[in-house]
UniProtKB/Swiss-Prot annotation:
Source species: Rhizobium meliloti (strain 1021) (Ensifer meliloti)
Enzymatic class: hydrolase
Record's protein name: Protein-glutamate methylesterase/protein-glutamine glutaminase of group 1 operon
Keyword Magnesium: no
GO terms classed as biological process: chemotaxis
GO cellular component: cytoplasm
Pfam families: CheB_methylest, Response_reg
Gene Ontology terms for molecular function: phosphorelay response regulator activity; protein-glutamate methylesterase activity; protein-glutamine glutaminase activity
Family: Belongs to the CheB family.
Gene name linked to the record: cheB1
Length: 349
């Protein structure tokens, strides 16, 4: 049996430190070894305690969590889980933190929340098991300029991508390979509900295609990428004559809403062999069954390989199910999607 994950909790609120510590200490596989109220205390605690994982508040006095995270990643890389308020400002800072190299993020409890930090323990344990990879330097920096796709072919394909932990860096890496006239692309990324709008805005600034948070009824168009809104509804595609987004208020699937499986299932039914399915880094198994359905429908399917995953969970389950046709390093996935889109000539029936 492995030793419990050793965690340092950093937050300027004593109440929040106590709540996070109580939630984590309730798990027998986790031990909170220390607490810190600001970056200076945290720096000393990291040196003295050498924790496996740090939970870090975004907003702190003197040096904020984003600045401190940057120092950690440059000087002493380790898994860090960001704890953020569910506000637009908090979301923007969290997206920036995930780009810098934070392992994952959780939202602070809202009034009336009966299960605060319900996913935090699982994320801490996954972080402790992971070997943090600097995808920013190993993959994103090597991305070549995007190559345009034939417009006549781009509109006949639908690309569907699913991701979870590590997905912010992974999606930036993939989408920066896409040209302005990429095939219509739909994405489900597990993320708190207030964060996806900021993430879509960030992707839109960084990438050649237009990236937007999906809205109900939005028609799928060449050169556009649609990101499922977090937390409240599932993203599907429907209407073969004029494919568009549909947001549905169904119960969580695999513990997630939106669910990657729900998206993949709908794309398999709508597009079949004219779809391209991709499963990226993430915890759990969401998306594996849906990717298998895509492959059985004739779609090409790709999975991120273990070496470049922050968490080789979703891609591993998909691969073991036989859902993944080809495993690829993250830096090659965007280019392979475009090659596949250019090669397949069939239209949606």
């Amino acid at each position: 049996m492995s030793a419990p994950a050793r965690v340092l909790v950093v937050d300027d609120s004593a109440t929040m430190r106590g709540l996070i510590s109580a939630v984590l200490n309730a798990d027998p596989d986790i031990t909170v070894v220390g607490q810190a109220a600001d970056a200076l205390e945290a720096r000393q605690a990291i040196k003295q305690l050498d924790p496996d994982v740090v939970t870090l508040d975004i907003e702190m006095p003197n040096m904020n969590g984003l600045e401190f995270l940057d120092k950690i990643m440059r000087l002493r890389p380790m898994p860090v889980i960001m704890v953020s308020t569910l506000t637009h400002r908090g979301a923007e800072a969290t997206i920036a933190a995930l780009e810098i190299g934070a392992f994952d993020c959780v939202g602070k409890p809202q009034p009336g929340d009966t299960h605060p930090f319900r996913d935090l323990a699982d994320k801490v344990k996954a972080a402790a098991r992971s070997q943090r990879k600097s995808m920013i330097t190993s993959n994103r920096a090597a991305a070549p300029a995007a190559t345009a796709v034939s417009d006549s072919r781009a509109g006949r394909k639908i690309v569907a991508i699913g991701a979870s932990t590590g997905g912010v860096e992974a999606l930036i890496t993939v989408l920066q390979k896409f040209p302005a006239n990429c095939p219509p692309t739909v994405i489900t990324q597990h993320m708190p509900h207030t964060f996806t709008k900021s993430f879509a805005e960030r992707l839109n600034r960084l990438c050649a295609p237009t990236v937007q948070e999906a809205t109900d009824g939005a028609r799928l168009e060449v050169g556009r990428v649609y990101l499922a809104p977090g937390g409240e509804r599932h993203l599907e595609v429907h209407n073969a004559a004029a494919p568009c987004c549909r947001l549905v208020d169904h119960p969580p699937v695999n513990g997630h809403r939106p669910s990657v499986d729900v998206l993949f299932d709908s794309v398999a039914e709508l597009a079949g062999r004219n779809a391209i399915g991709v499963i990226l880094t993430g915890m759990g198994r969401d998306g594996a069954a849906g990717l298998l359905k895509l492959r059985h429908a004739g779609a090409r399917t790709f999975g991120q390989n273990e070496k470049t995953c922050v968490v080789y969970g979703m891609p591993r389950v998909a691969y073991e199910l036989g859902a993944v046709e080809t495993q690829l390093p993250l830096g090659s996935i965007g280019e392979e999607i475009l090659k596949t889109a250019a090669a397949r000539k069939e239209g949606i029936e």
